[in-house]
Every structure is written in structure tokens, then in C-alpha cells.
Amino acid sequence: MQSLLLPPASSSGVSAVALRPGFQHSFNHQSLSTRSLPLFNPLLLAPKKKTTISSYQSPPSLSVYGFQIGGSKPSFTPSTVAFSYPTSPSSVPGDNEVDKAKLAQVAKRLEKTSRYFKRLGSIGFWGQLVSTVVAAVILSFSIVVTGKPTSPATFYATASGIAAAFVSVFWSFGYIRLSERLRRTSIDPAKAPPRADVVKGLRSGIMVNILGMGSALLGMQATVGFLVAKALTTSANPFYQGVSQGYSPVLALDVFLVQASANTLLSHFLGLVCSLELLRSVTVPNSESVVVPKVA
């Protein structure tokens, strides 16, 4: 029996069917008419490729002293024909105005912070410098006159506190230089020093003041204890009696060590107060709100 074979099975899953001659004639006149099935087109079954955007690299954002500037990520929706653009073109000028408002607030805050750093840095620098120099002169004078330290522990503890005070003076001068840098970068906030670096410097200055204050306190306590021991020894040996061997009365130079330790403590106290206030001003939450203009 002869049969007419249709084309072999295609990739779309249509299989070949064998038709008889009689059925072929009727199929040619009835089925393959103007009302016949549409011709098979493999292109219609091919999967449509969608043009999507898997990732979008947003422009780098600028974060300066609590403000986030720029970095807005536009939203694209998948489309089979073309990219979908924003429907409201007026949103771009609105974002620009918001960024300008944020930049103005950042510049204003940088200028205010620079003035605060300069004021407190100058107070801490000059106050610590005077107190530390006076303490160093008193300690040196007592050593030169007596020829040797009255108590080695007292001398070394007080000297360590004075050395830490000089380091704190140098740190306070760094605050003044930082204020000038902040004032220059208020025009271009992108060049401003990061807040993390400023906070790290302030914390380092606070640690120097705490260590120096502790050393000066130890020196003062040792000096006071030594003077109390001397005073008790002097009261046990009146002047009208014979002076025993090894007797050493309380001298004015011994009291100078107390004054040196007190000046060192004052120096570290000034530096600590200024550093803590500057740290508070930098890390305090920003209460200023950015006014967002309404786009018509």
C-alpha cells in the first residue's frame, strides 16, 4: 500500500503521519482550503528574548559628616521591546535640587565645625602650654637646687606626667591645623577629612590626657605621702633638742613638687575637657533637616 509520508518530525514535537490515497484527496480539497490550519512556522515557537537589566552600577555616593549625597539608583523595568525610561522627566531636576540642598548643609556644618575646632583647640593649646611649662620649670628648679630628687618614684611619676602633657600640647595644635583644613574644604565637601579619622584623632588625644593625668596623680600622692612623713619626723624632734642623725625637715623645695604635679594635672584636665567636647560635637546626631523642594 502506497502512502504519502509527511515531512519528518520537527524540533517542535510534530510527528509524521501516513495518509491513504483516498483520504489524501479529501484532505487536499477540504482541509487544505482557505479555512485550513495555519502553516507551521518554527519561528513562532522560539522563545522570545527579553532585554532586561540584571544590575545597574549606581554612581558613587558621597557621605560627608552625616549626609548622603548622590548615589540615586534609577529603576528600570524589564521590557521585551526596549528600555523603559522614567515617565516623569521632572524627577531629575528635583534630585539635583535635593543634592544641592544637602551640599549646602554639609558646607555650613563644616564651617561651623572648623570654627569650633579652632576655638577649643586654641584654648587647650595655650592653657596646656602655660601649665606644662610652669610644671617643668618647677621640677627642674627643685632638682638643680637640691642636686638629687627627694624621692625617685615621685620625680619619675611627675616627669612622666609632664612629658605626656607636652604630647597633649602638640595634639591640641593639631586641632588648630585641622580647623584650617575643614575651613578650606567647606567649599568642596568631597575633599573633607573623613569623620572616622577625626574621631580616631580625638580619642587618641583623650587617651594621652588620661594616661598623663594618672601619672601626675601618682606623683602627687607620692609627694604628699613623703611630705607627711617628713612633717611627722620634724614634730617628733623639737628644735631646742639635739638634732638626730638623718634628720631632714620639710623644705620649701619639697612643696614645689606638689605645685608641679598640680600644674600637670591642670594641663591634662584642660586637654581632656577640650577633646571630649570636640568629640561630642563631631559624633552628635545631626538635628538639622534637609528641606526637600517640591517639584510641580
From Swiss-Prot:
<keyword id="KW-1001">Plastid inner membrane</keyword>
<keyword id="KW-0653">Protein transport</keyword>
<feature type="transmembrane region" description="Helical">
    <location>
        <begin position="156"/>
        <end position="176"/>
    </location>
</feature>
<feature type="transmembrane region" description="Helical">
    <location>
        <begin position="250"/>
        <end position="270"/>
    </location>
</feature>
<dbReference type="InterPro" id="IPR022051">
    <property type="entry name" value="DUF3611"/>
</dbReference>
<comment type="function">
    <text>Involved in chloroplast protein import across the inner envelope membrane. Also acts as a chloroplast permease regulating the iron transport and homeostasis. Involved in the uptake and sequestration of iron in plastids.</text>
</comment>
<keyword id="KW-0934">Plastid</keyword>
<dbReference type="GO" id="GO:0009507">
    <property type="term" value="C:chloroplast"/>
</dbReference>
<dbReference type="Pfam" id="PF12263">
    <property type="entry name" value="DUF3611"/>
</dbReference>
<dbReference type="GO" id="GO:0005739">
    <property type="term" value="C:mitochondrion"/>
</dbReference>
<keyword id="KW-0813">Transport</keyword>
<feature type="transit peptide" description="Chloroplast">
    <location>
        <begin position="1"/>
        <end position="90"/>
    </location>
</feature>
<keyword id="KW-1133">Transmembrane helix</keyword>
<keyword id="KW-0150">Chloroplast</keyword>
<dbReference type="GO" id="GO:0042803">
    <property type="term" value="F:protein homodimerization activity"/>
</dbReference>
<keyword id="KW-0472">Membrane</keyword>
<dbReference type="GO" id="GO:0009706">
    <property type="term" value="C:chloroplast inner membrane"/>
</dbReference>
<feature type="transmembrane region" description="Helical">
    <location>
        <begin position="208"/>
        <end position="228"/>
    </location>
</feature>
<dbReference type="GO" id="GO:0045037">
    <property type="term" value="P:protein import into chloroplast stroma"/>
</dbReference>
<dbReference type="GO" id="GO:0005381">
    <property type="term" value="F:iron ion transmembrane transporter activity"/>
</dbReference>
<protein>
    <recommendedName>
        <fullName>Protein TIC 21, chloroplastic</fullName>
    </recommendedName>
</protein>
<keyword id="KW-0812">Transmembrane</keyword>
<keyword id="KW-0809">Transit peptide</keyword>
<dbReference type="GO" id="GO:0005375">
    <property type="term" value="F:copper ion transmembrane transporter activity"/>
</dbReference>
<comment type="subunit">
    <text>Homomultimer. Part of the translocon complex.</text>
</comment>
<dbReference type="GO" id="GO:0009941">
    <property type="term" value="C:chloroplast envelope"/>
</dbReference>
<feature type="transmembrane region" description="Helical">
    <location>
        <begin position="125"/>
        <end position="145"/>
    </location>
</feature>
